[in-house]
């Protein structure tokens, strides 16, 4: 009896494999003479017609390059994919990590987690968790994706049925590949980057804005089929894409994951504000003003969506 079931299972696997091969051959045939350009790939529509879309996922080989926007990418593909997704022109400036800017002038930028950093960390976490899936056997029960997430959630939850940023970070640190995001040349900034990207992941699915994730929010955050939205920053009735910059005196503010992040340097000389140097209180007020613009834009967007 078991031989018959085994033969049936093998037959089903063979049929699925043949269908996958046929779909692949069909796509290869339709897209044979289609050139989509860097950062894009050919896909087949429901009507069987070719179309060019931003690359869904690059191969994870590590060959860092510095983009013309000053950001370090894991490889050429990630750079061109980011350019496609953001609709901006980004070129390879040079191979390797972007060099650290030592100037304390307005060119100095705050350490931030861009959407591409956040999405790369999320991709690595999902890849790690999917590798732990164990299919059901003939006489044993395996582990599906939700069960694996539930296991890690319970392991790092302190008992309040919520994961805060420190607990989430400890969870991520269990996997060396997932945590090894090295956008900056020095380890201290990379360590800070990891914490910022964990905060950005929490913000993705934190529906009640308490900066903690329930299991359902945790499940949504790391759901492979969930497509993180592209958030923009608002300022003076204008919207700015991820990576956009603005300056106030000698400080630089960067748009990252929908939020303005600013340096906090004391200004003097030609960057002096009036007859006084910029105080920490003044800088705080400026950042709060930026965030106020952002919140107003988000509320307007939500109201417009409801009216539609």
Swiss-Prot record:
Kazal-like domain span: 48-100
Disulphide bridges, residue numbers: 31-42, 36-52, 54-84, 58-77, 66-98
Domain EF-hand: 144-178, 193-228
Gene Ontology biological process: endothelial cell differentiation; endothelial cell migration; hematopoietic stem cell homeostasis; negative regulation of apoptotic process; regulation of BMP signaling pathway
Family matches, as Gene3D superfamilies: 3.30.60.30, EF-hand (1.10.238.10)
Residues spanning the signal sequence: 1-20
Residue numbers bearing the Phosphoserine modification: 165
GO cellular component, one term: extracellular space
Record's function text: Secreted glycoprotein that is involved in various physiological processes, such as angiogenesis, regulation of the immune response, cell proliferation and differentiation. Plays a role in the development of the central nervous system, skeletal system, lungs, and ureter. Promotes endothelial cell survival, migration and differentiation into network structures in an AKT-dependent manner. Also promotes survival of cardiac myocytes. Initiates various signaling cascades by activating different receptors on the cell surface such as DIP2A, TLR4 or BMP receptors.
Protein name in UniProt: Follistatin-related protein 1
